[in-house]
Amino acid sequence: MTDQSNIKDANVYDEHGNPMNREYDLGRDGAFIGYRILIGQFYTSGDMSAPIEALKMKGFHVDNVKNEFEFISKLRFNDYQIAWVISASSIESPKFVSTLIDFHSAGGAIFLFADNIPYICHASEFLYEKFSIILTGNYPGNKTLRFRENGHLNAGYFGQHEIFTGIKNLFEGVTICHPVYLKPKNQTSMITVATATDGNPCIALFDPPSDSTEGRLCLDCGFTKLFINWDSPGTARFVLNVSCWLAKANK
């Protein structure tokens, strides 16, 4: 399955209009054996068991750590293809951002999660150093985004992209932030693919050119979907689709 949000021939749909069954995910179950994900869960209050089990169904090996020093050590000395970063309100290690930049520059892919202020720090500091982008905001969203081809810049919509395969309706998050581009030219680096119901970007992607050594990157601005809203419209499939896309593997 690739690049198909509006699937019309599924046998069963959920209450939100999204096709049920994992065959409509971007990646097949078991197809990602050998791919390793390191999760830096710096916002430690949430239960990550559901996302981790879902990733394992796709074949990913997943390690979840809750402090920066262990995250830095593992990212430097273990063979991970993807890093998840779930932001907290402050950064402890002065080496965190540089380590993440080195990982990304060498081809590592990153899934950045932020939420309302102050839970933006890890993602925002990385984005500032890498792209001159900061995160801000505390929008009480709690609504559902809808698919519209080429509608990604319209409030309340997401557009056509592989990461939205099998998703017609997608929960935006509860209290969410948004990116601010400090240099206008960098608006072409991180591409908005979904816009929250307040009109601000809420999901953005970086897909490096073919001659670049950098990895792919996704920013999601409402991370409570990983914890208390895992069963919200489209969430589980979206998180899995992004992880498969980050692996640069359509399997």
Where are these regions (language model features)?
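An acidic, glycine-rich "communication" segment
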Residues: 1-36, 113-200
